[in-house]
């Protein structure tokens, strides 16, 4: 092998592979193709048939045998290295090209993006410019409209000024104005009505003889009052026309013409009156009548022979009649001592202006129409004024005049005058009082106007017309000059001498008889109810709830009661001034309402020995009744069975008792001291139907979970099961505002504790409250409420919420005083969410918190335990006692880490200040998966509630018994699966505290079946009725994980304050059966240890006796010798 061949072979192998030129690389971005040159020449060369120069492959094949394998391997390696270098170079070129293209596209995208942003900015600027132009155009249009409106106003003003100028500059011969068609028709009707022949129908009264009283008192003809309507058979009358200014120079309301002088008009009208007035009694033209209750017949007599009645004054006694020293005559009216009725103006009456000079209450004084004075102030001198008698008096009127004159002289009514059919009782005192102050008419007018307004808003109330006004008969001077007297505040004022007398006394007498018959029926009904109470008492029949028929009209008549004072049956209060506080007025009104309830409703408890003076509870001095009650040993003989370790110095209410004057309880029939009431010391139940009236004004109970059916169904369930017959029915009352203010603020108390009528007497500044606090909101149902679910009824809710508080107070005080063993209050609305100044969650006043406060203040109760097992946390109760160590609050509620209403009640909330540790929150977590049930509640009572309660050792236990944790309530209002039977067992456990003084108050719970079942179970437990045992599955079940975690956290927090709960931390996961077995083993171990210790002591004592030296034997006695 020579070198040329080798070199040729080497050189021939080099160009075997051809790399694509660089120009082609730019067109191929990713892949590189390497292919051999002359691929088709290989078969020809291999065939050997062709000629030509050999290819490198052929040469390589020819040199295969001659080339060394080592050298061939080196050649191949060199070729591979060259290929790798070429490929690496191509990759670099491709990456550079890719980077270049990427940069180019990026720059292009940025340019497009900037162009797009620029277009958007231009469009936004154009839009803003269009809006500015539109606003500017709108502003210009508004300004143009305003200018147009001002121009129209100026034109109208100029037109009116021109018309006025034309009227001012008119000629005297032209008319100043043209009357409209309506005015002409009204004037024509008025003149036609005057031209008709009047018939007798009433007295014709007018103003006294004074120049100013004979003026035109109407600015127009349509100012007369509309006619009133009333029952048939009552005498017609007129109402007070609207007051109008008058000119004393005008004599009559009709306009004078230039052709008729004053004297001609006066003489012609007098002649017309004399011709057409055949009787002084005139009938109302429109034929309407008015009830006799609003029209009081008036018959005022003088005191001597020189004075007589006003009735049927002479028709011709007009202004031109001569005056004398004994007679000052007012046509169709009355003067003298009659206007001077002694009266005492109430504060609201004094607000009306009194101006005798201008006589703002002047009346229409047409000579042919009757004038109703309504007790206007007399303008003549009192010392020179007397009454003149009509020349013709009917027999009945003459008899009435003699009767009144006899009364004024100190005599008595005899014969047919005893019925007082024609003499109202309110006028008897008037007839006896004599002359009064000269301002009697004006003040009486103001009083009557306010009284009429109150009467239009209330129903007819029967008021006895005799036996109410104190008849003063001593030292009466029978002259027209009498000392000024005062009308007692309690005397009911009515329409006085302004009303005409009826044609005959039959109508008024019939009304009096109806009123007396109605009173007789009410009294008979009350006696029958009392008699039925005695008959059913021994038979253990269930007592029906006390109804309040008068409560339906209570709120509407409160304004009238305020005007009438304290009522006709009470003594007049001396020294009453208008400086009385608002609180005293409201409490006085509440006393009157409670007094009415005491008269009309059945007495619930028969505690003999009460005096007749103790008819109603005195809410102002709450301890007076119990002080007298506990001082009497005979009626409290049954109370010696149970001694309450409480101080009974003051009690805020008085026990109800039957008076000795009742026909059903004669004075000679007294139960012997050794015969106690059979079921006195038992469970008390309180319920009142007035709480049913708290409901939404929409009337749809389906959209409101808290409705009246809750307590109504509970009461019915207790009746059906017979449990109510085993209980003592306690009558409730309305809580006073002072009692409510022990927990709530004054603004909150007045806002939700007063009705719209008695709220008028409250200072408006007290009702303003915080500016940020809104009062009411409109609900989707159409009613109103304080929030989305707490409804409010403006007429009845205030009384209902106060009744709920008062019912619980009555029951709790009787239990604390030892009269009852325990109690269950069926009340609504609930109260444990109500805070000091906030109403929420169906709650307005916190009944349980108020009761706890008053038990401590009035009965000196030391420690109170409040257990709240409502599924919602009682945020209001916790707030009231958060810093109070004398009240222990334990709540079991659904918490869910603050995600369940109301969001409060975390386990870390343990109290503040001196009350740290006296607030225990068992706050369940985990939602309703799984739901909390009987096992969890019983475990909480076993490990937390009862140990802490026993260590606290309360005097009274109050339970906020909400039953919305009972199965049947959906998740928003409940969601747990506690059975009603479980709450009976929880109640039984609580009865081991405080000597059994446990009071349950109904709180939440909106499923009727659930709350009825739970209430039945709780009342059965309170009555010590054998309860249905728990299921074995419940006793074997273990608490769920969420409940165990909750109780572990509560024990960890509360163990710092109550060491008794520490020992239960280890056994939280055990079932009730296992826990009972463990406690039994522990108890047996303790007992065995105690027995062993006792046995050891006895053995030691025996051994000591054996080792001790025997005492010296005493010599035996010698027997006597036989």
From Swiss-Prot:
Responsible for the deacetylation of lysine residues on the N-terminal part of the core histones (H2A, H2B, H3 and H4). Histone deacetylation gives a tag for epigenetic repression and plays an important role in transcriptional regulation, cell cycle progression and developmental events. Histone deacetylases act via the formation of large multiprotein complexes. Involved in muscle maturation by repressing transcription of myocyte enhancer MEF2C. During muscle differentiation, it shuttles into the cytoplasm, allowing the expression of myocyte enhancer factors. A motif (Nuclear export signal) lies at residues 1081-1122. Residues 1-22, 196-281, 302-343, 481-504, 536-625, 1097-1122 are annotated as: Disordered. The lineage of its organism: Eukaryota, Metazoa, Chordata, Craniata, Vertebrata. It comes from the Eukaryota. The modification Phosphoserine is found at residues 259, 498, 611, 661, 1108. One of its GO terms (cellular component) is cytoplasm. This is Histone deacetylase 5. Residues 581-621 have a biased composition (Acidic residues). The modification N6-acetyllysine is found at residue 533. Keywords: Acetylation, Chromatin regulator, Cytoplasm, Hydrolase, Isopeptide bond, Metal-binding, Nucleus, Phosphoprotein, Repressor, Transcription, Transcription regulation, Ubl conjugation, Zinc.
